[in-house]
Amino acid sequence: MNICIIGDGLTSLSLAKNLVNKKINVHFYHKNKIEYLLSSRTIGISENNFEFFQKEIHKIAKKKFWPIKKIEIYSEKLVQEKLLKFESNKNSLFYTVKNDDLYKSMISEICKNKFFKKNIIKDNSFYEKLLKKNKYDLIIN
C-alpha cells in the first residue's frame, strides 16, 4: 500500500510514523525545507494518549515530558476564585512536551525508515500532477 501525506505538522508526522511502523509506504510532501524553529510552544497529551503514543507511534525519553498532576483554572473577573480544579495523587493528568523536541526526535527517526520518503512541493501544479500520477492508494492532506 502507498500512502501520500501532505503537510509537515506534528499530526501528519505522527500519522506517517504510525504507518511506517506498520510497514506501509509513506510519501511525505511539504512546501519548503523543514526548519526547526526554536520556540517555547508545548503540547499536552493525556495519560492514555501518552501511553498509546509511546507504544504505537514514537518512543521518546520520558525526561523530555513533564507530568502534570494538578490543574487549577481561575477567572480574570473574579479575583482568586477557582473555577475548576483537577488533581491526581497517583497518576499524571497529562504530560507536556516541547513541540520542537518531539518533532526533531520523530523526523530524525522516521527519515531512516525505508518505508518513508520525504519530498518538497516545488509549485502549485504539484497537486494536479499528484492526482494524474495515480500511484497512491490514499492521499491525506
Predicted regions and their residues:
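Receiver (REC) domain switch-region micro-motif
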Residues: 3-4, 139
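Glycine-rich FAD pyrophosphate-binding loop
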Residues: 4-8, 17-41
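N-terminal Rossmann-fold NAD(P) dinucleotide-binding loop
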Residues: 12-13
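A generic structural signal for short, well-ordered alpha-helical segments in conserved domains
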Residues: 16-17, 107
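Extended amphipathic secondary-structure runs
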Residues: 21-27, 48, 55, 113-119, ...
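N-terminal FAD cofactor-binding segment of flavoenzymes
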Residues: 37-75
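Conserved N-terminal helical subregion
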Residues: 66-141
